[in-house]
Each structure stands twice: as structure tokens, then as C-alpha cells.
Amino acid sequence: EANLLTDPFDGLVRRINPGGTVLNGRRVDTPQHPAGFVRKLAGMGGAKAPLVPVDIAWRAQPDAENTPFPTFSATYLQFLPPELIKGKIVLIGAVLSITDRHRTPLSIIDDGDRGNMPGVMVQAHGITQILEGRRPPTVPVSWTIGLLALFATLGTGLSLLRMGIVFNVGI
């Protein structure tokens, strides 16, 4: 199942779809609900894929000109040296300009090709994350609590100041 999970709140693709279905508290694969594409392919590559949706750790571009993954047109395949793809996982899919485009969290910084990716590229990000054992960056809970306390204190302090209507309207 190559379906992507879109966030119901904003429609962005953020998580890897494990596929399957949950029966009696366990995720199982059935003919109606097979394993997700990333989980299936990662298993073939010898990695253990998660059984729950996990955030995608988007792979960075090597530079401004190149994509995170090498891409080749099918018309040039016959001219490529076999060593280029030998022993590698190769995904074959369409990279069309209008169809099969999915908004990702990267659309915040680039609303073009990086932010609206073809499905095959989203799957490639998920597969390499599992095979490389990468996790998405997270903020430690202590930082979250500290920032929350700081801004709550700052907001409370500002609200206690009585500097007239100009100050209150300006904030």
C-alpha cells in the first residue's frame, strides 16, 4: 500500500504510513490492509520498520542544485552504467508537475518542488530514514517547559505594567 498519510488538520504529509490494520491492539497485515510501502521495502532491505506512524526525517539536499536522491529519466536508463544502481534500492515512479504532488512541512520554506513532492520522493525519504536509522529532530521536553514558563512569566509581567493606553494598544 503506497498510500501516504496526510494530516487531517492541514493536509501535509508528515508521517510514514505503516499500513496494515489494528486488530485486538496489534497491527496486522491482511489482504484488505497490506503492509505499507515503506515498511515492506525496509523489511526487504533488512531493517525493522515501525508498526506505528512515525514522523518523516526529511533528508537535506546536498546543495541548491541537486535533490536529496539521484533521479534519472527512464529514457536515459539504457545509457547509465549498471554499477550506478547495483546493490541499491531503486524506486520507479512518475515525477509529474501537476499530479501526484503532496504538500510536506518543507512547503514552509519552499512552496515549489521541495515543498510539494511527488509521492515517490516522499516514499524515498521514508525508506532512507528507516534504513539509515535516522530520527526526526525533536525539542527536549525540558526546553519546551522552560520556554513555556519564560513566555508565561513575560506575558504576566507585561500585563501587570500600567503604562497607559498607548502601551496596551501597542502590544
Residue ranges and their predicted role:
Residues 155-171:
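Juxtamembrane interface at the cytosolic side of transmembrane helices
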Residues 1-153:
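Flexible inter-domain connectors and hinge/loop segments
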